[in-house]
Amino acid sequence: MNIQIFGTKKCNDTKKAERFFKERGIKYQFINMKEKGMSKGEFVSVAQANGGLENMINWEGKDQDTLAIIKYIADEDKLEKVLENPQVIKTPVVRNGKQSTLGYQPDVWKRWN
């Protein structure tokens, strides 16, 4: 397995995801989205695997001003705006090769080989 966890250090679900893999002795790479974020290619790949751009956005997040802009701008501009503002992406984003999840989903991770 080649696990990557994209999240923030303050996110409780990200901490729980890290604990899940640590407890099972599974190595993972943590990417702090406040420092690095996701590349456009990574984001598009994860979005496709999880039902599209709209599902990637945490609409209940703290940054309501940015979320309002994303909600009402043209569809072709949304991707760039989300990539510029990684704080609006649901976390954790957990990747294992081409598979990925949004949020804390241990039942899915248990099935990964």
Regions picked out by a protein language model, each given a short descriptive name:
Residues 1-24, 28-33:
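Local sequence-structure signature of Cys/Sec-based thiol-disulfide redox active-site neighborhoods
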Residues 33-113:
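Thiol/selenol-based redox catalytic cores and closely related redox-interacting motifs
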